Amino acid sequence: MQDELFKTRYSKYGYGIDVRRTYKDLPCQPFWTWVTGKSLNDRPPRRPKDTLLKPWQLYLHISWGYAVFFLAVIYGQQLLASQQPLWLKCLLGALIMCLVVNRQRGFLHTFHYTTHGASLENKALARFTCKWILSIPILHTPRDEYVKLHVNEHHSVRTFNTEHDVDLVFMKQHGFYKGMSESAFWTRLVLAPFHPARILEHLKFRFDVSFVSAPRHERVSRALYWAALLGLVYASGYLEAFALFYLFPIFILTQYSSWIQHVSEHLWFARNEHGLPRFLHYGSLSWGRFLGRPYPADKQGLAFALAFVRWSLGVLLIDIPLRVFSFMQDLPSHDFHHRKPGVNFWRIAPERAANEARPSKFGPMTETWGMWENFLILRDHLCRGQSDPFGIVDWYRENHARLAPETDAANQPRTNQPASQATA
């Protein structure tokens, strides 16, 4: 049941409203759910296990990713050999690369959810899918190592956003820290992933986890797969297109695609300086990152026409490109993944909506609309010492007496608890 106390909270840089509600009368609501990343689902929440996919559903989802990879190389070869003007070749080539990046990172996030047990009920099939179907084609971290680094450390309430969290270490390696100058923040925000050292580190990491540090059976299977693939590509005469439209996107472009969303994924380097209950602090480090701006339904005549053009251009030139290139699949609702890691990515937007304003040990949900708001929140936190963008600290202080019966039991530390169980 919804509780006014747990209604969604917004930052000072946002619109102060649920922007998605302004889209509710537009046609084709599933499309707007995809564009914005936010659902208007008003049904009761489902149990996480009720959101899992059937094997055929997961493999249908994966198969269209393989189709994109295959067609990108085939059509890319034809494009390179065509007599089209250079500008058109560049435009079409960029679109192909964008789609390959989308599916490469789609594979990564499908692997991510499958590792969490949030794709298939059959765990043996899930492990097989992670190893042979999802990770080898993109040279992703082997499953067992990923469980250690991501599930046991990044998701643990004890190590999340600490020096033991590999995702925080990644931000530190890219030059971010609490107390940095604003000029350094903006410079690194834009340029960090293009630094040659960072690119080489990324390539070395992908090679090491696949062919050096991985278990022997992983190294052998990956070496055989890639030897066969490269041999087939070379023999068929598609090597140039394969390098440009497959290898370049998955090894280079994906870095910037990932970077755009990763920098605002959490409130990096934040510490529990105000003594919040542990799960409330954990929940305060993530927020819904949706794409859009209010639909101008309140305007009329010429004012509406001008506002509608501006709104439409924002959808076409900002929201859809960001959704395709960087915020694919579940990423707008990544905050809810940390609250309910067992919910499948196909259902995460509707389930997040179903859980909004419901009492939770993680506190009220929070959200932003647009990348610029995310960047300003991160700047304020890292450069200006303003580390409570949604007012969660004041919210807790004002409502502590009422919250205590609901949250204290869940927020008490548990002794002798394995890290793998200390997750959200």
Language-model segments: which ranges?
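Auxiliary, metal-adjacent structural segments of Zn-dependent hydrolase domains
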Residues: 15-102
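Active-site recognition of the HExxH zinc-binding catalytic motif
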Residues: 108-117, 154-155
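Core segments of transmembrane alpha-helices
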Residues: 61-73, 219-234
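Membrane-embedded alpha-helical segments that form the functional core of polytopic membrane enzymes
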Residues: 69-107, 134-142, 251-252, 317-329
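Long, contiguous internal "core" modules enriched in hydrophobic/ aromatic residues
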Residues: 207-220, 228, 235, 241
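Cytosolic/stromal cytosol-facing helical appendages immediately following the last transmembrane segment
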Residues: 1-53, 123-214, 242, 253-424
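Transmembrane helix interruption/hinge and helix-loop junction motifs
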Residues: 81-87, 235-243
